[in-house]
Amino acid sequence: MPTNCISYPETNYFTPLILDYLSEKKELSNFYHRFPEIENFGAQITEKKKSYDHTIRKDLIQVLNDQYSKLTVSENTRANIDALESKNTFTVVTGHQLNLFTGPLYFLYKIISTINLTKKLKEKYPENNFVPIYWMATEDHDFEEINFFNLNGKKFKWNNADDRAGKTAVGGLSTEGLDEVFKLFSAEIGGGENAEFLKSTFEKGYLEHDTLSDATRFIANEIFGKYGLVIVAAGDKRLKKHFIPNVGSELVEHSSHKQTTETLQKINSLGYNIQVNPRDINLFYLTDEIRERIIERDGNYFVHETEISWTKEEILQELKDHPERFSPNVMTRPLYQEVILPNLCYIGGGGELAYWLELKSYFEAENVTFPMLLLRNSAMLQTGKQNDKREKLKISIQELFLKQHELINRKVRKISDIDIDFSGQKEHLVEQFQHMYDLAEKTDESFIGAVKAQEVKQLKGLDHLEKRLLKAQKRKLKDEVERIAELQNDLFPNRSLQERQTNFSEFYVEYGEELINKLMEELDPLESNFKILTFGRE
């Protein structure tokens, strides 16, 4: 399969913070622990082995065995769960929401990056074991972010009748209503072996499991179980009890807010945007009905928009009795993950890494080893036919990533039989007016303003003429312009990265297991570039 790649800066889709992190800019070195290079994992292993509470392993295995009890578990996943008992076993984690039928393509890229990094670590450090973990965001409550997927330019949306949707953790929501989505999906995906696998996976996942959490675990296991992926839903009381001391310090001392405030000021002073601003208390109170913020006022604690309240002593007792009711938010969830897992590295997208970079001082204050942070692989999938079309249109890979009007203007200028670039004329005009400025200074300086006004007017006139000629030439080259726009629209649905829009089923129905196999082969988590992968020839 032909593979092409471009650098992340050339895509124009990554923020300055992430690009500077990838280039190991010195000013950012205080915001992370170790840069994710294979040689640096040795020290990370040593540190995590020393700092991790290995007694948690027993509870972790028990919880995983319970969560996998109704699934067909592959030999590789079973071996990985069992291996977690050993002090020489470590994890690599990616986290993701419970998007309907995995959501956009980058769900696959996240998990494949994670699996492939564990393989590389095993080669480099064979005396240890490395387990790829998918941390399901079962406690998120933003239902509108996850209740749809895009296939063939159409949006397949789940209208959940559960009135708790959007109010409490999505993992516990009923899968009711997904039979309607299944009918529409089945009609769209058609027939054939690959289509039957997709329909079967959707049907067994959502129509034979009662909760979104169980359904998502089934689907992720169907796709990635044979590679040894281990899926964690961390809301279990047996795991939450190990986070009690950290939740206590958050409630009483507002530790995450206190520790990250200075970091945010430093990040801001370097000219970067802040990804997440912490609240005073970065915890939710979670029940079957609600997930609402915990607020402190005058030494007492309240649950936002409810009648629930406690004194300090009462909330600490509630924490001791029901740790599962205290749900971390985006600022505290990373700490929880690193407390309960023997983890070395977190793999995420640019937005995720941006908020992780805010947290190092918080981890240090809580005496938890800060993991290495690795940007997940990114890719664009194209057909051989699309690649041929691009080459015929003489569009480079880099040009594909331009804004559409920039791409079209550039190509029209290039293929036009007349020169529509007036840069030379503008430079000549500026030179001519320089003589007039000199003349005005020598005669009467009050004329300088008039000269300037005339210069601006004439430059604007040239601009206007250039745009009119370009527009006329676009009309003349209408077919060419339409082919360019059509190709880019196909590869960048909704003028966005394909990986953030298109569901994997659109490609799986065509290429089946080849899709997963080729992604496993081609996506190198330690290779810092954006891949363009070509499937099939016509």
Curated annotation (Swiss-Prot):
Top-rank EC class of the record's enzyme: ligase
Q: Which species?
A: Christiangramia forsetii (strain DSM 17595 / CGMCC 1.15422 / KT0803) (Gramella forsetii)
Family matches, as InterPro entries: Bacillithiol_biosynth_BshC, CC_BshC, Rossmann-like_BshC
Pfam families for this protein:
CC_BshC (PF24850), Rossmann-like_BshC (PF10079)
Is Cell membrane one of the keywords UniProt gives this record?
A: no
Known EC number: 6.-.-.-
Q: Name one GO molecular function term.
A: ligase activity
This chain's protein is named Putative cysteine ligase BshC
Keywords for this protein: Coiled coil, Ligase
Q: Into which family does the record put it? A: Belongs to the BshC family.
Organismal lineage: Bacteria, Pseudomonadati, Bacteroidota, Flavobacteriia, Flavobacteriales
Segments forming a coiled coil: 462-533
